Every structure is written in C-alpha cells, then in structure tokens.
Swiss-Prot record:
Organism: Roseiflexus sp. (strain RS-1)
4Fe-4S as UniProt keyword: yes
UniProt family annotation: Belongs to the ChlB/BchB/BchZ family.
Residues engaged in binding [4Fe-4S] cluster: D36
GO MF terms, alphabetically ordered: 4 iron, 4 sulfur cluster binding; ATP binding; metal ion binding; oxidoreductase activity, acting on iron-sulfur proteins as donors; oxidoreductase activity, acting on the CH-CH group of donors, iron-sulfur protein as acceptor
Gene name per UniProt: bchB
Function of the protein: Component of the dark-operative protochlorophyllide reductase (DPOR) that uses Mg-ATP and reduced ferredoxin to reduce ring D of protochlorophyllide (Pchlide) to form chlorophyllide a (Chlide). This reaction is light-independent. The NB-protein (BchN-BchB) is the catalytic component of the complex.
Cofactor note: Binds 1 [4Fe-4S] cluster per heterodimer. The cluster is bound at the heterodimer interface by residues from both subunits.
PANTHER family linked: LIGHT-INDEPENDENT PROTOCHLOROPHYLLIDE REDUCTASE SUBUNIT B
Keyword annotations of the record: 4Fe-4S, ATP-binding, Bacteriochlorophyll biosynthesis, Chlorophyll biosynthesis, Iron, Iron-sulfur, Metal-binding, Nucleotide-binding, Oxidoreductase, Photosynthesis
Protein name: Light-independent protochlorophyllide reductase subunit B
Presence of the UniProt keyword Acyltransferase in the record: no
Residue numbers spanned by region Disordered: 476-517
C-alpha cells in the first residue's frame, strides 16, 4: 500500500464508511489505532449533509495491546446505547487487521440489542470500491426477503452512496425521468435505505444499477435469486439516455407480462415531457453541438481518465455528441480495465500497427497518468482531482469527471451526470473548462488596455515553456517512486543580432535527448504571433523536432522548417 503517496481509492474501511454513512439505522465501528480515524473527518469535510458521519472508531492503543485490554465490546455497547442503530458493522483497519484478532468473539461478548455484522474488509486484498460494493452485496444477500411483486411498474435503484460523484443529483434526475414514465421507485440503496428497506427489494419489477463500481453485483444477485431483471447501463449523454429509456420501458413491459400485472403496456411519452418546463427539448446538446463555438471543438483533443463508469460515458459523450477527438483514455480500476478497454477500443486512436492498446492506460500510479498527459498535450483533460493537480502544473484545462474529488465537486446545487439534464451539465462543463484563448489572444494582439496582465519578463514564452519532468527518486522506504515536478527552462543568453547558420546550430557532442534548445529572439517573436491556445503545442513540437534533428538553437528558420515538417 502506497500510504506515502496520493491514492485514487481510499482504504477498505473507507468503503465500509461510505455504505454505513449512506444508510439509516446503520452505524460502522472501526477497530483501529488513533491514526486510522482519518475516515471520519473526510466525511465531515466533503459530505454536504447536516448529519454527523455514522461511524465510530474504537481506538486500539499500544498500552491496550501490552495489557491485553480490548475496548471493542465497550465501544459497541456505547454506540448501541447512544445511537440505537438497527445494525452495527464492525471492521478492522489496515493496521489492526495485522493483529489477527477474533472480532466475531469480541462482538458477541458485547451483548448489544442491535444486530452486529463483522465485515472482513481486508485492506491487503481490496480497496474502497471493492470493499463498498462487497458490503452492499452482503447486506442485500443478508436482508432481502421474498416479496409479492408490487401491483404497478416499479424499480429499485442501487448504487447512489455517500461521497459518490454527483450521486445525489443523479438520483434526482433518475426520479424525475421515472416519474415522467409513471414508474414507482421501490427502494433506493444504499443512500437513504434502512435494513427494513433492503427486505423489500424483491418486490420491484426491475433494478436500475447505473454505476459499475457500486450496486451491479447486488443487482445481479437479485436477478439470479428472484428473477428481477437488472439494467446496468449508465445513461450518460442524450443518445445513451434515449436508449436507456427505451430499454427500461421494454424491460418493464416484459416483466409486467410475466407477472400478469400490466393491463396497458408502458410507452415513451413525447420527449418534451422530460424537460424541466415540460414544453421544450429535454436537452440542448444536439443543437448546441452544431453551433460555431462547438464546431471548433472538432479539432480539439481530449484525454479521459477515471473510474470505469464515468470514463466510458465521458469518452463516448465527447466523441459522439460533441465531436471532439479522443487522444487517449484510461482507468485506475485495474480490475475493470478490460471492460473499459472493450467499451472504448473503437474510440481510441490506433498506433502504427493499427492497435488502440497504446492509447489506453490502466494504472493506479498518478505519476504515470501525469506523464501520459504531458506526452499527449491535449486541449482538455477529463479526470480526477489528481489530474487537476497535474494539469495545473502543465497549464492544461482539466475537468473533474470521476472520484477522487475535492470539496468543489460536492455541490449543493443540482449538477447531475446522468440523463438529459446531465448531458447539459457536461456540455457546459466542457465548454467552460476548455480554453478558447480568445481573451489572451486579443490582449496579445491589441495590448492589455490598462488591465492587470503580467507579460513574462524573462523574454521566454509564457508558461507553455514549462515542461513536466518525471523523475525516479528513492522514497523514504527505499523503493523508487515517480515524482512530478515542474520547472521552466533555464534562461540562456542568445546573441542579439548574430546570424546562426545551420552548420553551427547543430548540436555536436551532447545527445539530442539531453540538450534543451535555446530560442533566439526572432524565433520567440515569431512564436508569439501564433494564437495563444495552440502556441504551447507548437512550441513543444518545435522543441522536440529540434532535439531530434540536433539543433541546439531554435531560430526563425528552424521554426519554419519544423512547422513545414510537422504539417502546421
């Protein structure tokens, strides 16, 4: 476990906390040392709810271990008396699991009135996503009871959870679409559900589980055990939402015929019924994508990285509905990498051999992702909070589309990702994040007009001249780790009026991989005439061309030569 580094996923007991904090009448107790109680303040900081996190840490200290004292039964009794939960979930943290203690015996000795579930969330076998999904599946298997089907079309919604990416807004969007169809919601879990709600899950006609990371295994179990069909597609984008609605109607009609409870088949209403005002188109994306502003995006390249659900949905949305080019994609969920690749292989650019595999990245090491972004230099990155940090150093616009996130992505306002409303939200986010560069370009052309605009004083081009240097260095535990740092090229004095010939410009002794070309004033002046929003890529391509061809100095002639060779 790379505890010293940023991680895309939380630890296993963080996943347990997400499920417990989502549900009503459920409380998590972590058997952990003082340092492992960091999970509690994460929920306090990020979750926009008025309630305290539904979790307690039963502290294990060195003195307790030396004296053979066990605090867990006492903590369970205190939680039972103060909180009065229906269910207490007990799990060990990544530290205390090494003690190999019998938590089942400790829990039984507490004698609580609440039911106690000891969940084996081994942090050396699983992380946040698998832990949360495994716990939800366990709870569904434990509490679901055979039920008579409801008399009207109904669905379960599995997946929305505490600290989920825009999950609360997604749930509102799903509720609106289902209400428009006249479909009843039986149970939403884990968000807002109690263990008594889980008992009622088999009464639904179908189960909606839009997130591959959470809820789909439980939905499949319900399908296997009770014959409840599961819809596992994520309606991200206008066309996927239309397909999702048609499939939902078809599934419910088939279920109604099987159950002999549907006299009149469900039908899709006019699409205007799904809009906020009930009169207009449900989404503005189809016409907005054809405007002059969005037509310019057809020449822009995007790199997408995140979890499985949002990476696949965002790549298809950018290419199919906004017309952007996909420079590459990837996921940090390595167990989902094959599924993500199969979904996206038709969207990824192929290499010289015709295979798109080189454009796909499956890793949970954020430095590898930062290196890929630096190599591709796309106009837009859609990623996580980690990619936002990397892109800030690279001066590349970044849109957060998947966890892990920071507090600015846990909003009070209605910002769904799913459905027609989500398509509008995503289109707005792409448009406001990707840099048109017109304001800075106009300032370059006509001056700042008295505005506070700092022109670089070094004579070097703007921050596009900064480059990402990814270097291996030893960490404190002796293992090499990749580090990301940003630095500008060292300023070098260039001859003011000298003429540099092609022969004298050639780098002789150093290899091209170690020489950083120096820009002459005339080349810098020519570079500044290139629009701001493509200047960075032009500069990087010219510098790469110069290093490949052994030029130690980039003159105006070298710049022209490079642009002609590179086709631009």
């Amino acid at each position: 476990m790379r505890l010293a580094l940023w991680m895309y996923q939380g630890t296993a007991h963080h996943g347990v906390g997400r499920i417990a904090n989502s549900m009503r009448g459920v409380h998590a107790v972590f058997h952990a040392p003082q340092g492992d109680d960091y999970v509690n303040p994460i929920f306090t900081m990020l979750e926009r709810t008025p309630d305290f996190p539904r979790m307690t840490t039963s502290i294990v200290s060195g003195r307790d271990l030396a004296q053979g004292t066990v605090r867990l039964p006492e903590t369970l009794r205190a939680v039972d008396a103060q909180v009065h939960p229906d269910l207490i979930i007990v799990c060990a943290s990544c530290s205390t699991i090494l003690l190999q203690e019998d938590l089942e015996r400790m829990a039984r000795s507490a004698g609580t009135s609440a039911e106690v579930l000891v969940y084996d969330a081994n942090p050396y076998r699983m992380q946040e996503v698998r832990s949360a999904d495994g716990l939800l599946t366990t709870l569904v298997q434990r509490f679901a009871r055979p039920q008579a089907p409801l008399p009207t079309p109904s669905v379960n919604i599995l997946g929305p959870a505490s600290l989920g990416f825009h999950n609360r807004s997604d749930l509102i969007c799903l509720r609106r679409m289902l209400a428009t169809l006249g479909v009843q919601i039986n149970v939403v879990a884990p968000l807002g559900a109690s263990i008594h709600d889980l008992e009622r899950l088999p009464a639904a006609w179908a189960t909606i589980a839009p997130y591959r990371e959470l809820g789909q295994n439980a939905a499949r179990w319900l399908e296997d055990q009770f014959g409840i069909p599961a819809l596992t597609d994520a309606p991200i984008g206008v066309q996927p939402t239309l397909r999702w609605l048609r499939r939902l109607v078809e599934t419910l009609n088939e279920a109604g015929a099987r159950l002999q409870r549907l006299s009149t088949p469900l039908r899709l209403p006019p699409l205007t019924a799904f809009s906020l005002d009930g009169m207009s188109a449900p989404s503005s994306v189809p016409w907005f994508a054809r405007t002059a502003d969005m037509e310019s995006y057809s020449m822009k390249r995007a790199f997408v990285f995140g979890d499985a659900t949002h990476t696949v949905g965002m790549v298809k949305f950018l290419r199919d509905e906004l017309g952007m080019q996909i420079a590459g994609a990837g996921t940090y969920l390595e167990e989902e990498a094959e599924w993500v690749y199969q979904e996206l292989k038709e969207y990824l650019p192929p290499d010289d051999s015709g295979s798109p595999k080189s454009s796909f990245l499956a890793t949970d090491v954020f430095q590898h992702v930062a290196r890929r972004i630096a190599d591709l230099s796309p106009e837009l990155v859609c990623g996580t909070q980690m990619e936002r940090h990397a892109c800030r150093k690279l001066d590349i616009p970044c849109l957060v589309i998947a966890p892990p996130t920071h507090i600015e992505n846990h909003l009070l306002s209605y910002r769904p990702v799913l459905g027609f409303d989500g398509a509008d939200v995503l289109a707005d986010a792409v448009y406001t994040t990707a840099t048109l560069g017109m304001e800075k370009h106009l300032i370059d052309m006509f001056g700042d007009a008295g505005l506070d605009y700092d022109e670089p004083q070094t004579g070097e081009p703007r921050t596009e001249n900064q480059e990402l240097r990814v270097e291996n260095r030893a960490s404190a535990n002796g293992h090499p780790e990749a580090g990301v740092s940003v630095g500008a090229a060292e300023p070098s004095a260039a001859p003011s009026r000298s003429v540099v010939t092609e022969e004298s410009n050639r780098a002789t002794t150093p290899s091209s991989s170690t020489v950083h070309p120096v820009w002459t004033p005339d080349a810098q002046a020519m570079l500044k005439k290139i629009p701001f929003f493509v200047r960075g890529r032009v500069q990087k391509n010219v510098e790469r061309y110069a290093m490949q061809h052994g030029y130690a100095t980039i003159t105006a002639e070298v710049l022209v030569e490079a642009r002609e060779a590179l086709g631009g």
